Amino acid sequence: QAGLYYYYGLDKMMLKEKLSGVYRNRVLNRKLPLIRGFDDEFLMPHSRYTETPAALIHGCKDLVPLAESEEAGIMLVVSKDGRRIFSMAHAEYDRLTLDHEYKRDLEKDLRPKLPVNYYPEDDPTREPCLSWRAHCNTLYTNWINYYVYQATPYQWGQILDEKRRNAATINLTERLSDDF
């Protein structure tokens, strides 16, 4: 959210209560390789007190929303030039991260709600089901492969030349978008 504000002036807003849980997200745009291999809908953990309104992101001509949740809002967005990727979810979370956050907030007497779609039968004494790992691995693999490895020149002169780096990223995005 800070990056969306810094680069595009998109303000975030406070939510009425903490958004916490594992939410269903749907793919909005299959033309970019960042979500290659994703199912039409996939699960991803979210945990935050603020959000950048989806209408602001959809209205920004320099951004391409890639995935969105009805409950959690925009999940993944990329700049049109492919150089900036923003995730409002927590693909890095392991099985117990939301559990630790929930128990921490209980200890602080913050009266947190149970994370949505996380504990089996909403029972916090049971081990949470890990339902997002495959898509997280795919996301990171695609990012490294398509946006870092294939778009990075390996000669010092090219690395230092910003115009060539931009052209490589844009060319890669245009070339691969036709495959979808």
Put a short name on every predicted segment.
Residues 35-83, 88-89:
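Catalytic beta-strand/loop cores that center a nucleophilic Ser/Cys/Thr
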Residues 1-29:
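Cysteine-nucleophile active-site neighborhood
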Residues 1, 23, 46-49, 101-102, ...:
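Tryptophan-centric aromatic hotspots in well-structured domains and transmembrane helices
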Residues 25-28, 56-57, 75-78, 107-108, ...:
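Short C-terminal domain-edge/linker segments immediately following a structured domain
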Residues 17, 68-71, 137:
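A short catalytic or substrate-binding loop motif that flags glycine-/basic-rich loops and adjacent residues
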Residues 82, 87-180:
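Acyltransferase
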Residues 2-6, 53-55, 94-97:
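Short catalytic/ligand-binding loop motif for oxyanion handling, primarily in non-cytosolic enzymes
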